[in-house]
Every structure is written in structure tokens, then in C-alpha cells.
Amino acid sequence: MKKGLLIILGISASITLSAQVPKIAGVKKVDLTNSNAKSTDGESRNFYNTATSNQRNAGPNAIQTAGVKFTSSWNAFGLLVSSSHCLTADQALNAVMFTHRISQDWPADANVASGYGEYSWSTNYGTTWDSSYFADQTSLGNKRFRYPSGAIINPAGNTNVANALNVATGPYTSGTNWDGYFGNYQMMVNGAGSSTSIFDNGVGTPALAFPRISITSYDDSSAWVSGGFYTDPIAATGYLGSNLMKGKWDGTALTWSFDSILPNFHQDATGANDSWTQSFVGFSPNGQIGYQVFFGVDGSATTSQTRAFSPITYKSTNGGATWNLLPVNDFSTIPAISTYLIPASDGNLKPWFDQSQGADIVVDNNGELHIVCTISSGYSDDNDSLGYTYTLTGQNGTTAQHYIYDVHTSPTGWDAWLIDSLMTTTSTNNTIFVDGSTGGAFATDARIQMSHTTDRSKLFFAWVDSDPLALAGENALPDLKAVGFDLVTGFKTPVTQFTTSQDFYFHYVSNVTLVSGNTYSIGVTNSIDRNGSHDVITTFDHYFYEGCKFNTSDFTVQFVGVNEQAANFGSLNIYPNPAKDQINLNVNMVSGENVSFQITNSLGQVVLVENRSLVNGNNNVQLNTSKLTSGVYFVTIASETSKVTSKIVIQ
């Protein structure tokens, strides 16, 4: 495996890279089709009749440095889409689960073939694993099931994996076309009651293809996944919008239902929609407040700034029964975004929301939507050139190539936080991977993903980046990075680099973070080919990396945007800090309001609450802290219109 110059920036250390003025190398039309992730992989074989013992069970030639090997897949095609939730977790079960193409190491079974799927799970955070297969290719008409992703439906109050349900969806192929899709469910421990529903395109089913984005389960025993609505779903061409697939468990059976959303996309001169060909769906924990997000140009946008690839967002407040389109928004008015944009050819700023480095969404503890992705600069307002962005060249590897954002809704409108910047771009010329089915190189990107605690009060963002001084600034030597945001306290962790091995390939991040005391464990997998050829059509081994963890004490940086709801608080001063028996708060109010003062400890537990009626102008408030033990606390001051949080230390 090739290694370049290694710059060790430090494990568990904040990484700050200064972005210089970017050099513009030109413009490009972005590939919106995700075409490299639609290989039909027409092969179908019983690998116990064809594979040698060495292919199945011997020590691999290519070994992943970070993590412990726990399973494998027939090839890498099930790993290609980072927005598929292939890795998930459940707090009540203390379980992590990986959904994938069936393992090359499955015990000898005359029926098992390469088109099967597999659930692999652990209840001790990767120490031991169990698994069961699903989507029986042989008994279901030799359909080749592809791109599986999955979720755990766990009934309320249950802590026994025997009573939990696995659920998965994906497309299937005959080897030439995409002929339909499937939905599977079965009991978690032993695969009991396994049921796979087959939906053939053109036979009384929606024009759906590739139900593989955002699959997540919710407290109402439902699971949602987003697929595409196509004029020709068999060829996966003519993208029109989304087709949502919902599975609902009633305690004895799971029923699938469908809905579609077809936005009014702007069209270019060829009649093609200006949009990415995958969308995202997510709900609040109770399954009631939901969002469907497309990246594209809204046909009703009228200004240069809004005629850009932006979130086209639909919201539901009744569990997906109905959806309402949010108004067109000008994201160039958000300073965190506009600061790093390059003016388009007409002089306007055109924020261009990009999926090429990965993207994800989460609905937080307040029912607000969070979108993570990179944002580029749109180049033109010409009707046929809205899909063009600037191409930047790194200045000896020192220029940030892509800026990562959390763009979110709030009670006062849209806002954004700058998460970090990528110092490398997609690896195309220097990737180690090849696609034997096409004979070409296989590119690798940052695979940006999001994880959240069960209550959605903490969000974690993870991606890979490489040494910017090696291999022409391409992301060919990836290491894992992550950062956490506490939405209650308004503090985040430093961006932390967790690995230095430069080989963290094809990673998946669990969409659910497991919490134990003060520790937040984010499950991550990474994968490498077994035989050392780096061909994505060969067997890939999967490794579980358990080292991506944060502690409550890591949330030390107050992040930009915490004062986004603080419009009525003209100023705030808290003293002394550190304090002992009392803290004094000087609050300057723009207008009089009833205000709540709340102190929480480092575990998020409320230890003091007082309500006061404050007047316009300066207000002095004293809070008795004499009964608080020594440590770090957070003071949240909230009114009906404003909210602000500050950190204090009690001695």
C-alpha cells in the first residue's frame, strides 16, 4: 500500500489549518448521477462451490491498520454510498449492527450465494459478533440483492436483543438491469420470521429505484428510507424526485408503504433536472417531525443567489402523512457561508450544496433539521450552467479544498456552523483502488457522515482527510477525524484526528452514538480488499474501530451560532468565574421579557432553575451556587424569543 509523507498532527488534538486565498484552476460541471455507485455487479455464484479455502478463511494479504476484522463481503459495491446507513446502534440494547453483502466466510451452506445480505451485530461494542443472513437469493427467483442498508426496530422499553427487529432495504438486479427492490425484516437474534418483500418495477409498484439512503428507525416502531423516483427505474435514468419507503412494525408483522415527492426542479436545455439524484429523509425520535431534503435548483427561485444547488426541503409534523415545502432561502446571507464563497461570473455569491464528499441529515432534540455537507461556489447563473462550480488548486497542499458545514433550521430561520475544512480533494489519479468491472480507477472521497445521541442533544460529524502535502493533495491516504456538538450547552469538542495509519478506507459511521456515563462512543467501520489487489470487485474485509470516542470534558469550545437565538439579549456578563457561593449575571435586554435561568452539570442534568421577569435595559441577577459541587457547569438563559448559554466553573 502506498504511503506518502506523514504529518502527525496529534491524536485527540485540535487541528487548525489556515486557509489561504484559493487559486482558481477553472470550472467544472459536477457529476450529479452518482454513477460510480450503480454497478449492477451481475455476477451470481455459490461461493462455497467456487472459492478456495484461502479465498475464504486464510489471512488476508491486505490488512486494515485501524480496527478489528469482524466480517467480510463478496465485494466492495455495498460500501460505495456513504449516505447509506449501513452501520447503526441501539442504546437500550447496547448493540451495534452492520448491514452488508453476505460474508465470504459464512459457514458452508449449499444455498448461500453472493446475492444474499447479512446482518452482523455486537452487544459488547465489537468484542464478539453474531450474524444472520437475509434476502434468500435462491428461493426468491435468483434475484441478486445489492446495496443493503439497515436499521434496528426496538419496541419501547425492551432491552433484550431477542425481542428486537432487523430491517433492511435495497435494489435488486437480474445482472443487466435494475428490475426492482426489496424490503426485509426478521428477529434480531436468530433471524426468526424472516420476510423479504419483492417489488418488481412496472408491476403495480411505484417507479422507485435504489432505496438505500438515510434508513433509520424511530420510537414509533417505524423505519424510513429514501429512494429515487425515475422515469425509467430499470435503467435508473430520468430522476424526478424521491420515493419514500416506510416499514411499520405492529408487533407481529412489518408492513411497507410508499410516498413520493417530486419537486419543481429547474431544468436545463436538455430537459434534465438540475438536482442531485439522491435525497435524504429523517424524523424526530418519536417519528412525528420529519424532513425530506433534496440538493438542487428550485424552479421557483428568481435571483442569482437562490438559483443555485441548495436544500429543497419538505417538512412533516404528522409522521409523514403530509409534507409541506419550505420557502426558497438565500443561503448567501448567512455569514458563516458567504465568508468563503467566490463570486460567480455575474458577481453574485451562489452557495452550491455538494454531495460529492458525502452528506447526511439529522433532526435534533428540538425538532430542527441539520444538514451536513460541503458547500462550494457556483460559477454561473446561465440556465444551462447552474451545475458548474469553481475548480480550486491547492497551494502546495495548504489550501482548504472544501468547507464542511452544518446547515440547520432554527426558530428564526436558517443558519449554519462551519464544522471544518478538508485539505484534500477526491482521490482520482492517486487512488489505490481499481474497478475490475470497468478497468478504471475507483475514486475515494471524504465520506462525511453524522451521528447522534439517542435524545439528539449531541451531534457528531466524522470524515476522512489525508496529508495535503502528499499525492497531489488528493484524499488517497485517509485518516479519521471527528468533532462533537452539544446542542444543550452550546459547546463543541476540538476537531480530533483518531488515526494516523493513512488507510482508513470505505468507512461507515454509526448514525447512533452509544453513551456510557461521560463517554460517547461512535461506532465506525472501515474496509479493505482481502487479496491485496485493491480491486473493488474482490472480497472486502470489514474492521470495527472502537476508538472514536469523546468525553463530556471534551466539550470545551463555545461554537459560533450558539447565540443565534439571543437576539433580545443585548449583552451578558457573568462574574466571578470561577465562582463559589454565588454568580452574578448582568443581562442587558433589548425589551422586557420573562426569562428562565437554568444551570446544568457536565452530564446535562439540571441542578438549578429560576424564573425572573426582566425589564428593558440592564438587569442584575444573583444565583445561589453554594450547594453545587466543584466542577464545570453551563448557565442557559432563555426567553420566548431568545436563548444563550455560557460556561462557568464552580470551585
Feature-to-residue mapping (PLM):
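C-terminal outer-membrane/trafficking sorting elements
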Residues: 3-6, 15-18, 564-651
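Repetitive helical segments and hydrophobic/amphipathic motifs
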Residues: 11-12
